[in-house]
Every structure is written in C-alpha cells, then in structure tokens.
Amino acid sequence: MRIHFFAFLIILSLVGCDGWQADVGKLVRKWNNQRTIDGNDIEKCIPDDGEQCTIQAGWNSTQVCEYVKCNDDNCEGGGYVLWTRYVECASSPAVRIILIITGVIYMLVLFIMVSSAADDFFSPSISSIVAHLRISESVAGVTFMAFGNGAPDVFGAIASVLSSPTPKADLALGELFGAGLFVTTMVLAVTIFTRPFKAEVFSSIRDIAFYLVALAFLAFCFVYYDHVEIWMPITFLGVYLIYVCTVILSQILHNRHKKDEEKVDEVKTVDTDSLEDDDDIYVSHGHHVLHAHEVMKMEAEIEAVEPLKTWSFRGVVHDFKEHLKPWPSMDEWDEMNIFQKVIAVLNTIPNFLFKLTIPHSEQPWSKPITLLQCLICPVFLLFCIQVCSISPFPNSPGLWMYGLILSVLLTAAVLFFTELHKEPPFYKSLISYAGFLMSIAWIYLISSEVVNVVTMLGVVSRVSHEVLGLTILAWSNSIGDLIADVSVAKQGYPRMAMAAAIGGQLFNLLIGFGLPFTIAKIQGKSISMIINPTYRLLMLFLAISLIFTLIAMFAQKYFLRRIHSYSLVFIYISFFVFIGLSLDDILVWN
C-alpha cells in the first residue's frame, strides 16, 4: 500500500508539471527574445494588448512580421516550431502558401502520432494501473485521467493569472467554459459513438451534480458581483475537497460491496460446443478487449523475444532489434489495407521513438532496454514540458543537469541491482506508472505542436478573437482529452472515458478558478469579473449539455446509445448558431 501511495504522489506531481508546457515555453521564448533583441530592434516592436495576438487590418507584411516576432507568447501555441513566425515572415506569397500547406500536412502527421501514442502506450499503462490499484473505472477517470487531461488548463490559468497585475476572471473562466462545453458535448459524443455502454449510475450523477453546483455558484457570483472576493475561490476549493472525499468514500463502499459479492461462489458452466462454433472469440488480455487472433499474435511476439542470457554485442543488438522494431510483422502487413499500410509507413519513425522513450508494461523484461530508457527518459521528459533550460535556483545549472543526474542514478540502480535474465519484483507495476507518465509527456508535446499549427491558421485567417477562442483554440486545447478518452473507450473502458470527460472538466473549473484566484487575492490583486453575452451563452449551453446527459441517462436506463451522441453534437452546433446571432446583434442579451 505504501508503494501505491508514493507512486500515486509522484505521478500527480510530475503530470502536473506537464501543464506548464505551453505557458512556460512561451515565457522562456519571450525571455530569450528580450535578451537577443538589441536597442534598435526594440523600437521596431509593436506592443500587443497583453491578452491575444491582435494584428491590425492596415499593417503591411513587415509590421506583421515584427509584431509576431515580438509577441510570440501570444501568437504561437507553445510548441517548438514557430509556424506563425515562419508564415508571416515568409519572403514571398508562394513561400507563404507552401508553408501553410506544409503546416497542415505536419498537423495530420501529428494526429497519426498522437493516436498511436494513446492507443499503443497510454491505454495499456492506464489498464495496468487500474489492475494494480484495483480501482473502479470511474475513480481512475476522475483521478489519473482527470489530472492528466486537466493539468495544462489548470496550470495555464495559474500562469496567466499570476503573470498579470490586474487579472480578469472572465477571461480565465471563458477558456475553461469553452473547453468544458467542447469536452462534455463533442468528446463525450465521440466516446459514446465509439463504444455505446452502460454508465455507472452513482458516479455519473455525482460528477454532473457537482459540475452543475459549480456553474450555479458562478452564475450567482456573476449576477451579484463585478469583482472576485476571496471567499469565492476558497469556496471552489472547498467544493473540490468535498468532491474528493465523496469519490474516496464511494470507492471504499464499492470495495466492501465487491468483497461481499466475492464471498458467494457461483460456478457457471460454459457450453464448449458454442465456443467451438464461435468464429471470433473475445478475451481479456492485460485488461484490453482483444480478438482471439490478436491474442495469438501478441503471444507469438512475446514468445519470440527470449530474455538475454549473457552480455554480448550480438545479443544486445538482437535484443534492441526485437524490442524496438517499429514496423509490423509480415502477417500483420498482409492483413492491412492500403490506407493502413500508408499509416504504418508514416508511423515507423514515431513508433521507434515511442518504444525508445515509453516503457511498456506488456513487453517482456529486457535489461539493456531498461538501462537505455533510464538514461533517456528523465531528460526527455524535461524536453517535452520545455523546462530543460530553466534554473530552479539563482546561479544554478538548468533542470537538464538535475535530470541527467537522475538518469545516472536510475541507470546505476538498474545496472547493479537487477539480473540480466530475471525480471525484478514490482517491475510490471513500476513500469506501468513510468509508461503512463512518458506517454502523457508525449501526448502533450505533440498536442502543443498541433496547437502551434492551429494558432497559425487562426492568425493567418484573421478570424475574431471570440470565434478563435471558441473554435480553434478550444478544439486544439482539448485534443489530448479527445485522444485519451476515445483511446480508453476503444480499449474497453468507456465508463472511465466518461468519468474523465466530466470529472476532468469539473477539476479544471474548481481548481482552475479556485487555486489561481485564491493566490491572487492573497497577493492583494484586484480581479474584475464582468461576464459578456458570449460567456453567458457558454454557461447556459454547458448547463444544458450536462442536464441533457443526466436526463438521457435515466430515459435510456443508463445505457448510453449513439442517439445520445447525435443529440450532444446538435447541442454543440446549436450553441454556435446562437453565438452567430449574438455576434451579429440579432440576439441581444443584456
């Protein structure tokens, strides 16, 4: 139990660091720009409005380029490749068009990569953790997946609030509302469409009820106050504390009920003739729902990789080849269609990098591979969250040095305290947590690059900030939620995906509003809270989507069918119809 507790704390703390990815990356790039720009260039800089990338209609290409260079903290999405700068500073219109097309193709490849990372590495790690801790799907959804999916939004809100001398609650909440509406409608709709399932009654009602209470409390604050009082964010933190206690209590009661059921031994006979007649048997392997032929392939692959007996150059090379090969087997290749073969070819290099940097709990023990991953993963994790060059203390080396020290310590521990041909105790359990952490890091690294491309498309198209925030930015910020939730749903955990979709956004709202504004009020900052018609519609349709899901669950006797997903999509489309009417002043909400 002690191992479970410390492993859980380590994962929560490190996954939380992933949330700083976009904002820390922006701050680091902005600081580097200020160091490299000389006095003459500073005069060329066109200041921004402090909130968004605002390009005026009358600017020429040189002014736009200088503005983007000086304000890449707002004009870029937080990744390493600065697409907005490349496009806006292109030497000719032809180069500009080529860069835009290249960016779109790059984004499509990134979608293939993030899908592979989620399906082949993130989901197996989640499955192993659920089996190891023996927790229900709903608890796993509102803990591991909620923290993993929600960390960027929460820490992004903290960074934006603390970096501003006069933070605005409506701007921070607008981002949380936009992501919340998209996830509770579109992401949940795709999850249900992927795998219709019977919802967990108590946990679903609990999550929706807490979410509606939080929205009602915010509506009360917006109606009667135009600024944030310190008791408001503290109340949100208190609500989240009550929510956590409710989750823990429900898990305790669930475990007791499960033990009572296990006391009753029921022996069920199986008709062997029916099994022989079944063309395609479904089995559970490592908590993944697999076809019989898939299990035979997996077992054949595992049996083909024999543990290394002695240290030899040829043996180590062969071990690397068997564990890190990024291409499918000949049997799998023959069964693929043309589209799948193209995807497999495009995914060859990414798959090799994934296997090199993400420990996999379903792979057999390999000491050389484990040594290599211990050496690479800590520093690569810092690279993913863009903090390698950050110095934690004055006059201290960057975090990359501390990561390198950790790599050496882990490598030495594996080298001296494990055997070559024998898997150490607790290896599968520990490797599941490490795989979860590294797959989350990869998903956020890829998602940040997608956000960069999407932000570039938004800046180039010159759409309004409200439309950009409600569409492109909301969608791009929720890519990780969409990929992770759909992935675990396909692997046989749709209830976990639903719990993550609703519970994760509840976590974002309660902590994303409660924590940063509590800190800001303690610092003595004045925080305005004036809601505009767009945010009112956001809150209204977010409440409508939650109430509809609650009522539809009872109407369908808790089995969520595809008609439910169609209805959620209709709600989301209706929201944009009302937004369009509001922006055109056809619908006026004073």
UniProtKB/Swiss-Prot annotation:
Q: Which UniProt keywords apply?
A: Antiport, Calcium, Calcium transport, Ion transport, Membrane, Signal, Sodium, Sodium transport, Transmembrane, Transmembrane helix, Transport
UniProt-listed InterPro entries = CaCA_antiporter (IPR051359), NaCa_Exmemb (IPR004837), NCX_ion-bd_dom_sf (IPR044880)
Offer one Pfam family short name for this entry.
Answer: Na_Ca_ex
Q: How does it sit in the membrane?
A: Multi-pass membrane protein
- Per the record, the coiled-coil ranges are none
State which residue ranges cross the membrane: 97-117, 139-159, 173-193, 208-228, 230-250, 368-388, 397-417, 440-460, 499-519, 535-555, 568-588
Q: Give the highest taxon in the source lineage.
A: Eukaryota
GO MF terms listed in the record are: calcium:sodium antiporter activity
**Main subcellular location of this protein, as a coarse class:** membrane
Signal peptide positions on this chain? 1-19
Listed under GO biological process in this entry are:
intracellular calcium ion homeostasis; monoatomic cation transport
**A GO-annotated cellular component:** membrane
Q: Where in the cell is it found?
A: Membrane
- What's the family? Belongs to the Ca(2+):cation antiporter (CaCA) (TC 2.A.19) family.
Q: Report the protein name in the record.
A: Putative sodium/calcium exchanger 6
